[in-house]
Amino acid sequence: NRPPQEFIHVAFERMRIAYRIDGLERLDPAERYLFVANHPFGGLDGMMIADALIERFGDARVVVNDLLMHVEPLQPIWLPVNKHGRQTAAYARRYDEAFAGDLPILTFPAGLCSRRRGGVVSDTPWRLNFIKRAHASGRKIVPLYVEGRLSDFFYRIARLRERLGIKLNVEMLWLPDEMFRQGGSRFRIVAGDPIAPDGLRGTLRQQADTVRGEVYRLKEKLPCTK
């Protein structure tokens, strides 16, 4: 069994995927961070950021859909969340222990990959759990912006599903194919300044929206080259 980072490197080499991330070098490795990012890809973005966090901090954890536990080489870094039923006691304990620990944690507050609305690709409304966890754990929040989008086909399927009133995210079935479509690409990611949760104002929803706004403002700070 390969270590998670080695598995990621082999996968990216075979897919000819590369990325550049700016801003992590400004962060104190001794701090406890909760990284929050937009979610354009539904898997690939998590692997890129996880690789960068392991490189910078030595290890990391990523909050993911529990279906990704089937990717066995990455199980050590996953914090699985059951989005289709009750969370198991083992998963809940793993989640709590990670937030109580010191390793950096990455989460995608949208909970699913971005969708297209009015011609603009952006996250669906963010869930509030990351704000609650940041306050409870005393972790500083680091916003991350990931450049990228999926195919027009994926967004059309998602829109059709919504128009038909189907609640199940059937477009998820195309995510593996969408990931392989990204082969040969280079991506840009940028990290913002840490945000102390105690410095956020308003309701939990307002606080989450503030952080989301910071994430999307980082688009203006993407490095000029990939």
Predicted stretch roles:
Residues 47-53, 121:
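"Short basic amphipathic alpha-helical interaction patches in structured regions
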Residues 37, 63-64, 108, 145:
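Short beta-strand segments
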Residues 1-39, 44-48, 57, 75, ...:
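Membrane-anchoring hydrophobic helices of lipid-metabolizing enzymes
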Residues 91-226:
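Non-catalytic C-terminal accessory region of glycerolipid acyltransferases
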Residues 10-16, 81-87, 119-120:
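Short, flexible loop segments at the rims of nucleotide/cofactor-binding pockets, characterized by
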Residues 54, 58-100:
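Conserved nucleotide-cofactor-binding alpha/beta core module
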Residues 15-21, 87-89, 171-173:
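Short gly/ser/thr-rich secondary-structure transition/capping motifs
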Residues 34-36, 80, 106-108:
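Structural motif
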